[in-house]
Design a protein with these regions (language model features):
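Bacterial Sec-dependent signal peptides at the C-terminal "C-region" and cleavage site
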Residues: 34-46
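Acidic, carboxylate-rich catalytic segments that either coordinate divalent cations
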Residues: 242-290
Length: 290
């Protein structure tokens, strides 16, 4: 069912070509020793610190408009937010709380099980640099849509518990989800590099985005848009010579780690178990990665 979008007055006054400076807490990404920094306008990218082409790429033309009252997606967002408040203090709530972190070391740990490898910034510096640089690019582009739609976060619309301090997210917008964009960027690239573990890796990336719904800081529609935003931007950067070179370097690094893991018989970790979607019916048989 295609629901026609009705532009709200608070969106009408926004200038289509405007880009806000990246001022959120995720604007600066720094890994000691890697020298990776992201803090500029999407149209002022330093060629040495981005995989994006110089040509203009507008994510606003790609993602669906943010839901407004009268849109069926708006009503679905309200229902999902209220129902998922019942997950407070559950195992899934605790996972969502852990997924609040965007630190590269924590993300590498989260994806280690699905990847079947112990990944750290120390043993995989080229992989870490690739993922951080790509995620900075996808986040910059995603921020354009955030500042265009300026949609409120769900806990500002309906009352309910959230899994992180409201002050950490109250000064930024809901749609599309930046956390989801980051998680899907990491998952997509890791799945490209480790296709034999793609199911487990992509499922973890999906769960990372769904954690924002469970946490109560993003609407379900914002999570869906965050995945699309990441995928679209990743598609645009594929032809970048620097991106291709960094992918090749990361692949060599992973091949070395796989050889070391095989020698120590540690491939095949508890991460083989795929985290069920929060939208999976209770009677759906649990699936295990192959």
């Amino acid at each position: 069912v295609v629901v026609p979008y009705q532009k709200s007055q608070n969106v009408d006054h926004l200038r289509r070509g405007a880009l806000a400076k990246w001022a959120s807490r995720s604007a600066i990404i720094l890994i000691a020793g890697l020298g990776i920094h992201a803090g500029c306008d999407a149209r002022e990218l330093d060629p040495a610190k981005t995989y994006l082409p110089a040509t203009r790429f507008s994510i606003i033309d790609v993602v669906p408009p943010a839901p407004v009252q009268g849109d069926a997606r708006y009503d679905a967002d309200r229902e999902i937010f209220l129902k998922t408040r019942g997950l407070q203090n559950s195992d899934r709530w605790r996972l969502a709380t852990r997924d609040v972190s965007e630190r590269p070391a924590d993300l590498l740990q989260d994806f280690s099980g699905p990847a079947g490898l112990n990944l750290t910034p120390q043993n995989a510096p080229r992989l870490t640099a690739l993922l951080v640089t790509a995620a900075a690019d996808t986040a910059r582009v995603n921020n354009e849509a955030k500042n265009y739609f300026r949609r409120q976060r769900p806990f500002k619309i309906d009352a309910g518990p959230i899994c992180q301090p409201a002050a950490e997210v109250s000064d930024s917008y809901d749609y599309p989800s930046g956390h989801t964009t980051r998680g899907w960027t990491w998952a997509s690239l890791l799945a490209q590099l480790l296709p034999g573990r793609a199911s487990q890796i992509l499922a973890r990336g999906r769960a990372y985005g769904e954690s924002r719904i469970v946490c109560g800081v993003h609407n379900a529609s914002a999570v869906e848009a965050g995945r699309l935003s990441a995928s679209a931007t990743l598609t645009v950067m594929q032809r970048s010579p620097r991106f291709q070179a960094d992918m090749a370097a990361a692949l060599r690094e992973l091949d070395r780690l796989k050889r070391q893991a095989a020698a120590n018989s540690i491939i095949g970790t508890p991460g083989d178990q795929i985290i069920p979607s929060i939208f999976t019916p209770q009677n759906h048989p649990e699936r295990v990665g192959r």
